[in-house]
Amino acid sequence: MAEKKIAFRNRQDFSKIPATIQIPNLIEVQKRSYDRFLQMDLLPSERDDAGLQAVFQSVFPITDFRNVSQLEFVDYAIGNWECKCGHLKGLHHLRTTCKNCGATVVTDPFHPGDVLCHKCGTFNANTPDFCNKCGDPVGLQLKYDVAECEERGMTYSAPLKVTMRLTIFDKDPETNNRTIRDIKEQEVFFGDVPLMTQNGTFIINGTERVIVSQLHRSPGVFFETANNRTYFLGKIIPYRGSWVEFEYDQKNILYVRIDRKRKFLGTIFLRALGLRTDEDILRTFYTVDRIAVKDKKLYWTLEPGIERPTNLVGLKLSHAIKAKNGEEVAHSGRKVTASVLKEIQKHKISELEIELGDLEGAYVASDVIDTNTGEVLLEANQELTADKLSKMIDAGIGEVNVFFPERDDVGTVISATLRRDSVKTPQEALIEIYRKLRPGDPPTLDTATALFHGMFFDARKYDFSRVGRLKFNIKLFDRQDPTGLDKRTLDPDDFYHTIRYLLKLRRNLGAVDDIDHLGNRRVRAVGELLENQFRIGLVRMERAIKEKMSVYQEMSTAMPHDLVNAKPVMAAIREFFGSSQLSQFMDQTNPLSEITHKRRLSALGPGGLSRERAGFEVRDVHPTHYGRICPIETPEGPNIGLISSLSCYARINDYGFIESPYRRVKGGRVIDYVQVTHAGDSDYRVGDKMEKSEAQKANEELRGRKKRGIELEPYSFYLSAWEEDKWTIAQANAELDEKGKITSELVNARKAGNFVLISRDDIDYIDVSPKQLVSVAASLVPFLEHDDANRALMGANMQRQSVPLLRAEAPIVGTGMEGVTARDSGAVVLARRSGIIDSVDSERVIVRVEGEHHPMQLSREVGSDIYQLTKFKRSNQNTCINQKPIVKQGDHVKKGQVIADGPCTDHGELGLGRNVLVSFMPWRGYNFEDAILVSEKLVKEDYYTSVHIEEFEIEARDTKLGPEEITRDIPNVSESALRDLDESGVIRIGAPVKAGDILVGKVTPKGETQLTPEEKLLRAIFGEKAGDVRDASLTCPPGIEGVVVDVKIFSRKGQEKDERAKQIEGTQIAKLEKNLADEIRILTDERLKRLEGLLGAKVVQADLHDERTNKRLLTKDAVLDRETIERISTRNLKRIKYADKDPRVNEQIDEIEEMTSRQIDVLRKIVREKIEKLQKGDELPPGVIKLVKVYIAMKRKLSVGDKMAGRHGNKGVIARILPEEDMPYLEDGTPVEIVLNPLGVPSRMNVGQILETHLGWAGHELGKKIAEFMVENSEAGQVRKHLKQLFKDTAFVDHVTELDDEMLLKVAKGMQDGVFFGSAVFDGSTEAEIKSLLDQAGLPTSGKTFLYDGMTGDRFEQPVTVGYIYMLKLSHLVDDKIHARSIGPYSLITQQPLGGKAQFGGQRFGEMEVWALEAYGAAYILQELLTAKSDDVYGRTKIYEAIVKGEAAIEPGVPESFNVLIRELQSLCLDVELIKTKEKAAPAPVAAD
């Protein structure tokens, strides 16, 4: 794998199949789609007709009803593009002109190197404009960044401004011609459009959300069977608009259905399309031949030289055919074949004599009319019988057009339907269709025509889409070229082709479609989903604009902003992000769950399936899923198969179809291809693809001529599901020799969805990698190939639920995907530019950027990058996001290198759990049924301790009775309850809190009550505060115990801030100032470095005195060094005399000074603006004066009841935590850390966990061996020799040989905790390799050893499997689930207690439990449970009174549910009364003494 090795962790890789291409960026799906939708960083002239641009152009221009004014769309802009100081404005500053074709070329200020012109393929110099004040290029400047939006509960967005043009016309009342009176253009603010963050998510109202891509049925034409292949169905499905279905029944009648309404005859539809007569319809679908009558003989006429279909083929000749020269072309009785027909045409024979019997089954294609009398002898579509023919001959008719429905591919359906059809004109047909679609509406010809035309031929109402047109062309014409795809409505020919294909299906010509084939399902990603919402909003807005234009009094003075109200558009966007089924709260449990959520595909959602109606076929794994959708990762519940995940290498093409990469195979040899990334001095163009050998030859030739070579990258062929069907594709594990030739004669391959054994010469492509099949989560499971599919599914899903631990640890047995996943998830911090680490602490890393330019060229590659690390931030799932630096001061970092670990990452690799020593054995019944026995060591040493952060907020509002107040002065609360609140009433950071503690004190005004004179007097004497307010403080809810880690206070603008808010603000300002000081220090250092490069080591020729004080600063012959330059001012530096001084030096000194001071000024200005923003106050919802957020961190140690799991679906609950000394121990006295039940393996068939155990043990022990060796030998040569001995016969030996001494020692040091392995999915280590490693580690090759009972010291009878497994703690923690209720809330209507932890509810004593008590005759317990403890409101109060008075009697009242029943009956108009009758009083129960 070509990944950068980070921080010296080397995984020993077992894979035999080299990865030829890198895994594409894992969240590219989201980013690419949204970028294509917004096209925000492109100028209007550069935008494609896609996304927002396409939506605006499809809805505009909008014309009023009178046709005298028109509103057009000109262009749009998103966000403010300017430099840091605001001096440069506009995107055009990031453009240059192509030296070859003059087109505008996009430059990239952050990546040095040439930029490509996409029009002509020429490379141009990368020359964006840099501001001469701040030295920065133009960038998107936002009001609030991501972190601020999360804190303040805002949406991360940028303003959308649209330029509109309003044209007003004068209309000539006579001719109706329009002339332009006035044109006005104006920019209209539309609203804020949410932006995507770097990690592919959206911040909506302060919470991070993900838009899940939807898998839906592709638009196009589809054919399917109905009723067990007796007849077929054809559908034309558009992207937007009416569906059309064609079907025929057993009686061979063609029907059409529009939008699933009532069906009508197909010929009515054809007439409405413009086929006026029966003859038109018949000629469109059937092959028509001309039969001539001469001298009462019949002749079949042919048109020589013109190849057209004829019904002659298949006919037996009744007369021999002779050429003009008398040569016999075909003898009589011969069957006419295609070759005979060619001969006939070759000899230019124009007619063949036939007999009457040859016309059996013929029908006339056009009316046969007696020219003398005008009588219609035969109507079109009538059968041509012998007596009809003789009548014709008698009438002297010389020719007749015939067709043969039985012989024709199309069959008898059209002919039979025509006979049923009573409608004869297109006008009647349109009215008939209108009646079917709008039953009840009286039809007129105009409305019927408008309706029918609008359905399929109006681009505003019907969109077949580029995809639909592409699928249509592929299905009906097998044509894939991208031309003609912009024809997005239908025309009559499209319907004719569809009907023709449908009718031919009966003759097995063509194929029906498999609806679950991935060629027929496509992905709608974020951009497209949002595009549809925008269109909905714009269409609503269009109606409003049209109405406004019509009623506006004075259109001549109107401006575009008077007409446009963008609220419906922004409401549609808000609704989509806030409440759409596909806009989901991001699963942020750990980095893997984030990545998986972004790569998820859902078949649910608007326009998709519903889980109730989805059948088995849709959910099932389909052969086309191979390499596109993971067959393993899918939920276990009702959504199984409907929600899936993209495979590792899969990508989504421009049409929305999923593609998978393959390598080319020619003649049984795998050919590596490359793609040109820079043409150098060759004639190739960027993007050209060629064989690697050809490229290498070209490069050698260029180097020989001392020219610049071609820059290349590996290329693979991405194929969509329908393209793949044409080829034969071998699996990645087919054995190859060193030249790439497939070694075995027969190869396992896939062809058109079937798995076949085929000759190697017939192979066209081969898979890129075995990982290609599975998704990211499944590719993180080592030995996946040894696990049963159901368990692999659980393993992949449970990794997503793993909780970030206090100390992350990468797995000893990994798969090699850990680094890629961590990097692409955004959990780790990557260096933006190369440089040297200037300073590091727990909160930030400063990288001093290196300028790789001429020392005098003041480049922007100067200065520093400050990385603010995230500290103890709460995630969506309340887990803790914390970043820790992994670099040291002085380290050199490259661009893209990991400089800080995030949650669940260890040295840039994903680490979801811990490596623990496990034995498989039963232990006194404590690990029965998947339960887990754990050593106390794991609790003591915080192996599985995790931190969870809860957020609580309280707002002080302005109420009708007066403002609420956040204060420490709360009525009737003891001082001890307030001990941790500061003077502002907010809890201090670091305070330990438990349930019931006050976090923020708040008082709310009470309604005024009538006071007695005595109370008024007391009020007047003692002050009135306490009386008229009540306590509304925020208290810690039950089940929460932890430490306050952060407090945030937001005050409304214009409100006086309290002390605590000022203190928090002070801390934030201090941070900003500290960063500023560091940036200024680095800039001044850089200035010195440049001055030193200019003046350093120069010898002074004369003494230098200060101009003003005349103090001597330098003596003659002094040598200028850094310190000297630093203490002399710029003014005096310019006066220094030394040998061969360049006259331009003083200019250069001025330039350096000016640049530095300008950059420092800009930095100060930016910090000043940030401080002003902090001091200004916050934007809060209406009515809110102050908002306080308190964050509480809880430490969750491993405890009994927590759920743990391995990566193979082996999950269980902790049943007991045993003291270390009681755990079973190895022969050297090491106690095991976890005991698992061996019965969990055989029936589950997840043997991967056993192989992982063995390999993990070997890795751990080898690490121990290296550590022991390095204690005695720290010399590099010795270490190298030792490592070579340990890893003999592996690829790692070559790696050890290549490393220099310093790196070698670092690698060896990194191996002391264990040797890390990469056992890739389907290409992992073999049993023999594991045995060999166990042997090298000095362990038994069986992987079993004898254990001793920690309680008795006795040896167990049988050897036990022992080793290291990677175990995860899942986010199903017992502390979050356990719950107890005393007295809590009751349901409002039934008055019964609520259920569930969230409602502080109780356990339901249900029907079956009542039966149990009835069986025991426990009447009093039952009475109490069903009345007082449930819904007897009167009885509840009586019991309370009885307890207070110390009485024991219980007096049940009427249960509230009885009253509910009575109300229910009364609502049905049944008058129910309760009639009380006096009963004898029952003897009271005797109270116990």
From Swiss-Prot:
Protein name as annotated: DNA-directed RNA polymerase subunit beta
Name the GO terms of the biological process aspect.
DNA-templated transcription
NCBIfam families on file: PRK00405.1 (NF001616), rpoB (TIGR02013)
Stated EC number for the protein is 2.7.7.6
Query: Per UniProt, which keywords does this protein have?
Result: DNA-directed RNA polymerase, Nucleotidyltransferase, Transcription, Transferase
What GO cellular-component annotations does this UniProt entry give?
DNA-directed RNA polymerase complex
Q: Name one GO molecular function term.
A: ribonucleoside binding
The entry's function note states: DNA-dependent RNA polymerase catalyzes the transcription of DNA into RNA using the four ribonucleoside triphosphates as substrates.
Record keyword Iron present? no
What reaction gets catalysed by this protein? RNA(n) + a ribonucleoside 5'-triphosphate = RNA(n+1) + diphosphate
